[in-house]
Amino acid sequence: MGRKDGENLNSNTMKSRDFNETINGVASTASTECTNQQQWTKYHSKQGHGFAAEDANALWDKMHGKRVDKVGMDNSKNGADRIVNGVEIQTKYCANATKSVDAAFENGQFRYSGMKLEVPKDQYEEAIRIMRERIGQGKVPGVTDPNMAEQIIVKGHYTYDEAVRIAKAGNMDSIKFDIKTQAVACTFACGLSFAVSYCAAKSKGMSHTDALKFAAKQAAKSGGSTLITGVAAQQLLRTHVGRNFAAIATKAVKPIVCSAMNTEVGKNVLTKTASVIAGKQVAGVAATNVITKALRTNAVVNTVVFVGTSIPDTVRLCCGKITGREYAENTASNAAGVGGGWAGASAGAVIGSAVFPGVGTIVGGIIGGIGGGIGASLGVKKMFSFFK
């Protein structure tokens, strides 16, 4: 007979805490990737709302099933910001329609030949009128029909004011945007947690029904935790404190990455890792930048994950439900699980990619993450057991 939900779920059997810590660590890789796809480092600048508009509109397109390539992140002059289903789009979000359209002109001529010009949703009609005038004045090379303005101007999915708010922390527009950004990481955490928890429950003799219930609970916890910490990290990175933290992390990790790149083994490992992270072949300085960027953002994300997952134990400590020693052990184990999960996932993804690109990358990342996270977490607990 299968055991009931609730039986054997203590620390001596299910080890669900170890799984949760590890899954949070593995999921942080997905959360970091979601964060790195945004141009948050530029949100605080004078044109920060423009970069936020690019990110928000690109995300909207992705979530509506369109194929999006954010080619503009390399800041090439007069290049498209993104390519959507093969169509090049340049985004201009200024205070009014005249300024938004004028930003696409240089020396009196339209400088984005063959591209669509995306403007704030609330400026669309006025922008079309202005573009008609520009075409009539011969300022759009290769276009003579004013009615073509409707083919050139694209209505953005957000207003100018919404873009301004998305670039800032602490408001509903930016929080909703971050929730959408972290949806992928949340889904990943839910699926991984469900699978791991179900297998663990079945291995302990639980019935199929009870194992499903247990797995569903764990999936909800992991998904919710990943979503909350991911959003919190993105909100933090919009603040002065968050940017300073990221800058310190960059200064700390870049010399280490550069030193590793100077050795043959380090260069090979980091180049392969960078290629997996970037989703394309990169080398040299580009690989160094990819790794540094990933480590920088992950330091912030993992710190938020660690703090968030440590809150329950902190509350229990303050209420006298656990001892200081238990708190120290749980906290250290938590940190090891999160960090080990991320490190294991990164290493596993590289190995999996080498064996079977695509599927191997995903499977390797999951297996490596679980192994690394649980190994690190149990290692810390073993160390603490020596002092009992």
Regions found by a protein language model. Give the residues of each.
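Helix N-terminus capping/helix-initiation residues
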Residues: 96, 120, 159, 205-207, ...
